[in-house]
Amino acid sequence: MEAPRGWLVISVLAISLASSVTEDVCRAPDGTHGSAGIPGRPGRPGLKGERGEPGAPAIQTGIRGLKGDQGDPGPPGNPGRMGYPGPSGPMGPAGLPGLKGTKGSPGNIKDQPRPAFSAVGPNSVSRDNVVVFGKVITNQENVYQNNTGRFRCSVPGYYYFTFQVVSNWDICLSIRSSRRDQIQPLGFCDFNSKGFFQVVSGGTVLHLQQGDQVWIEKDPSKGRIYHGSEADSIFSGFLIFPSA
């Protein structure tokens, strides 16, 4: 145990001596900076920074360049929506006649209108000189009015009208028709200087529309018709065929 204690004493003395020597040495002034050394190697790339704020638009100072060449056509687009119908075009030329159709079934004549009338008289003469044949013999479809002496068309078509009037005086009669508010007369006259009984007759074919009227009219100064039991005057008419 004596040896370790001796080494401890020696160590303490050595430290004390070194401290004394250091305190006795004078401190020298600092030296000047030396020349720059050689640049070191580039360091490793740093991390990617955040995106910066947009820059202000630049002021265009150059001259606008020429128009470039036309680019290649792009791919076709999708079909658009259907538009509104356009106006009707002009009528085209007539086509070729079609084939002849098959024969139809026979019609029923009973279902066809057959206007016809016949009346005798006269019973009277109206103020407008219309001869009224008041005694009706036939009045199919009720087309003749025996109180006015007028036929009224109910079926458009072609009609035949006739009259036979007995007189022993000069007489002038006319078949008159109204169509579209226009009066169309057809006159017949007979002169009797001897006072014998004679028959004045007339007839015509008329194309009538629905609502047209036909009647017999006398001349105011030459229209004396015989009234008696020996002879009758008659006014008749009927449809020949209807209009297509």
Curated annotation (Swiss-Prot):
GO biological process: complement activation, classical pathway; innate immune response
Entry-annotated residues carrying 4-hydroxyproline: P39, P45, P54, P57, P73, P79, P85
Organism in which the protein naturally occurs: Bos taurus
Protein name per the record: Complement C1q subcomponent subunit A
Source species, domain of life: Eukaryota
Activity regulation field: The C1Q subcomplex is inhibited by sulfated molecules, such as triterpenoid sulfates, heparan sulfate, or chondroitin sulfates.
Modified residues (5-hydroxylysine): K48, K67, K100
Amino acid composition bias (Low complexity), ranges on this chain: 79-94
Binding site for Ca(2+): Q198
Main location per the UniProt record: secreted
